[in-house]
Amino acid sequence: PCFFGTTNIQNIKDMSTRTKRFILPESEIPTQWYNIAADMPNKPMPPLNPQTREPLRASDLYPIFAKALADQEMNQTDAWIDIPEAVREQYKNYRCTPLVRAYEQEKALGTPAHIYFKNESVSPVGSHKLNSAIAQAYFCKQEGITNITTETGAGQWGAALSYAAKAFGLELAVYMVKISYEQKPYRRSIMQTFGAQVTASPSMSTKAGRKILTDHPNYQGSLGTAISEAIELAMSTPNCKYTLGSVLSHVTLHQTIIGLEAEKQMAMAGEYPDIVIGCFGGGSNFGGISFPFMRHN
């Protein structure tokens, strides 16, 4: 939010001496992601294999995800995971992102609290989603995968993965929830600009999509439907894997670069947060900013 008001010359002079944006140099981009599961005294219960009803193993995920990503997903022992140099090189295009002191918001609220926000919108695609998209595309490329699939709702994740797929020379198929496909043509254009094939979901290109359209011809789509189509395509296409933009542990792992940078920037500001707040959908944004701070508790 932006707040505007009048001020006097003395206030302007006072403002000129205060720092609003705390910027880290490229050399301070973290070299490791933080895996909070390793530090949890009570480990999360493992998901169950839907076929065997037994605890899921990393190898159960290999047919769907790149092996390195499946291993990260199930890793509950290593607190720190190295960030490959090729990923850090891509991060340098927009990281470290600024930490900003929200003086105007503090004034508008009349609060004595010091409010800071981590501005992930400076990434080439305008969101934090690129932090994991770059990592996932890299690990797929390293495994020799040539094609990847995904779903997207409003298009933020699809745009991020399109950028990353282009950077690492991968072919990408995106199933975009139909209502968003129709309402957000510019987001679709961004994906197509980076070379992605974008299909409105449900579609006639998969069994899952055809079944839904047969039963509900006017259905406007959902993330669940788009996921079903993306996984089906990945499973039926040679040398192809599925990627996901939130919810899973390895996605949140990649997003911890946000909080790790913010820690250093708060030190630059000479403060430490009492409360960390983040928007929460699938959880990768909130986990990314909060997990590095939570490890100290």
Please identify what each model-predicted range represents.
Residues 11-297:
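PLP-dependent amino-acid enzyme catalytic core
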